[in-house]
Amino acid sequence: MRMRAFARRCARELLRDPLNLAFGLGFPLVLLFLLSALQRNIPVPLFEIDTLTPGITVFGLSFLTLFSAPLLARDRESAFLHRLYTTPMTAPDCILGYLLPLLPIALMQAAVCYLAAMPLGLTVSLRILWAVLGMLPMAVFNITLGLLCGSLLGVKQVGGICGALLTNLSAWLSGVWFDLELVGGVFEAIAHVLPFYHAVALEKALFAGDFTLAATHLLPVTLYATLATAAAVWCFLGQMKKQ
């Protein structure tokens, strides 16, 4: 009950910044339309709409860190968390309270991307539903990674870390903009170790209906989501003990 009340409070805080939400939802659409237009003039297999849309959807999830990190950082720098520490809520309760309001935003973001791609020629099938649901582990990873940053850094710092570093990591290491095999070497090896490439491959496999391939990419993404959540809880617990 307390956790649900806290989650509702976090949802209200997120809705107080509609410009940030609009940017998170709108910027992936701008990229989708621009790259789709580029594909019509200079055909590139990587930018075909059925291949591009799953990748853009996953890239858009990186903006979830821009929602979760500043929210926690602001609470940490204010007196709010000091009051929260005096309640019976545990660290997992608090992390869930921050996490749960952002999951519907992630689902809406993915749904909007796929809906916007339909007039551009996206193949419409029930597999879109699986693709939308399949991005949830990566959404959890991005949200809890933002919470981890918010637990350790100030409001000004998380803007640079989450707004620049993490979004660029997602862009360059996911294979959305270029085929990682063309670069090869250490760069490709690093990309395959991190979750961004696997999240895009998972989304593409689900959209294509290849559930066997999807399962191979689901494991590393889920593992990273679990580790990020555990790290966020551990850091939040450390902050509670300091207070």
Indicate residue ranges for each PLM-predicted region.
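Hydrophobic alpha-helical transmembrane segments of multi-pass membrane transport/permease proteins
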Residues: 13-41, 49-69, 103-108, 168-171, ...
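Short cytosolic juxtamembrane segments of multi-pass membrane proteins
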Residues: 236-243
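Hydrophobic alpha-helical transmembrane segments of multi-pass membrane transport proteins
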Residues: 30-31, 48-119, 165
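Membrane-interfacial helix-loop-helix junctions in multi-pass membrane proteins
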Residues: 41-42, 46, 123, 174-228
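Transmembrane alpha-helix boundary and packing residues in multipass membrane permease domains
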Residues: 32, 36-37, 114, 118, ...
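A short amphipathic helical element positioned immediately N-terminal to and/or at the very start
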Residues: 3-15, 203
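Alpha-helical transmembrane segments and their short interhelical loops
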Residues: 91, 95-168, 210-222, 226-230
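Residue-level recognition of membrane-helix boundary sites in multi-pass small-molecule transporters
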Residues: 19-20, 93, 158, 189
